Swiss-Prot record:
Keywords: Amino-acid biosynthesis, Aminotransferase, Arginine biosynthesis, Cytoplasm, Pyridoxal phosphate, Transferase
Similarity field: Belongs to the class-III pyridoxal-phosphate-dependent aminotransferase family. ArgD subfamily.
Main location: cytoplasm
Protein name, per record: Acetylornithine aminotransferase
Top-tier EC class: transferase
Organism this protein belongs to: Corynebacterium efficiens (strain DSM 44549 / YS-314 / AJ 12310 / JCM 11189 / NBRC 100395)
Alphabetized NCBIfam families for the sequence: argD, PRK01278.1, PRK03244.1
Sequence positions that bind pyridoxal 5'-phosphate: 117-118, 143, 231-234, 289
Amino acids binding N(2)-acetyl-L-ornithine: 146, 288
Residues with PTM N6-(pyridoxal phosphate)lysine: 260
Gene Ontology, cellular component aspect: cytoplasm
UniProt subcellular location: Cytoplasm
Amino acid sequence: MKNLATVEDTLTSWPQVLLNTYGTPPVELVTGKGSTVTDADGNVYIDLLAGIAVNALGHAHPAIIEAVTTQLSQLGHVSNLFATRPVVEVAAELVQRFALDDATIASQTQVFFCNSGAEANEAAFKLARLTGRHRILAATNGFHGRTMGSLALTGQPDKRIPFAPLPSGVEFYPYGDLDYLTTLVESDPTDTAAIILEPIQGETGVIPAPEGFLTGVRELCDKHGLLFIVDEVQTGIGRTGDFFAHQHEGVTPDVVTMAKGLGGGLPIGACLATGEAAKLFGPGKHGTTFGGNPVSAAAARAVLSVIDEEFCADVARKGELFAEQLRGVAGVADVRGRGLMLGVVLDQPVAKQAVTAGFKHGLILNAPADNIIRLTPPLVITDDEIRDAVRALAAVLAELNA
């Protein structure tokens, strides 16, 4: 057996052998349990990022460990030329969670599995084009991925411009502006295929859609025969206190994309379609080698077995506790979001410095903007961990604002 390459120091070797897409990380994490992680020097942190909203059940959750270990010992990968039970069970459960026990909706809903949120949005993009119409309307500041198709849907010029020309036919509307969106649709309704949005924009600072906006978009799509695509990659799987964030308004999209928390740390994404949208794909129209891998599907099945209605209600409660505690911290101007997807708006542009200072105070933070800290902790975070995190963040901000 060949001796594998040896690495003397992880952080020193990182920039030598990995393409410079992320810069060099500040710490090397080696273990995790629940809502905490430990670095190579033994420092313990409360993880308020959860792998960017991925580790819904935290680190080393026993249900995921058991499911993955059992499945991998039986069958690891076979491709979609063959059926495996885990993928069918996960699809059936997602259909039920989407349909909210409406048998008619459930009977018209199907799922495509892939590996990530970007791939799920690529599938949604292709569904929209299969309607025979060309235009897709996406929100300014929205984020749907970094592959070429999902990047075309992303309303952030700094991410788009270096890779032009992107797939054509995407036009942008101000997020939350229903009047502008209506005018844009009605400028060419017969060539407009779909409207895509996130219920809460995460990458630009945790910005919820205005109340009633999703309902208005649903009505606009119904009027003109458009697909309503909701990107739940970051907001879905219980993150906001509802299983899907769009359920907060009681709307039913035509297409829902998801990933991140679905696998609880293993790579799996999904594009769910209902009604006429579910009839657009046929054999050969789309595919993926690893999508629906039985090991990732087993992990997703374990996640879904834990995240039930009672669990989601507790996420909502913990989110309210977190927000209430944060609003009392000096240096915090506002807290927005729902459930355990929160944007902490600071009264000074020190969010990026807070991320760095957070390590010294035992916190893993994320700053999508100069004055915003994004919090997406594991959904299993405890009340005591929330209070400890708020105290630590208060110390960070006091230090920076001194």
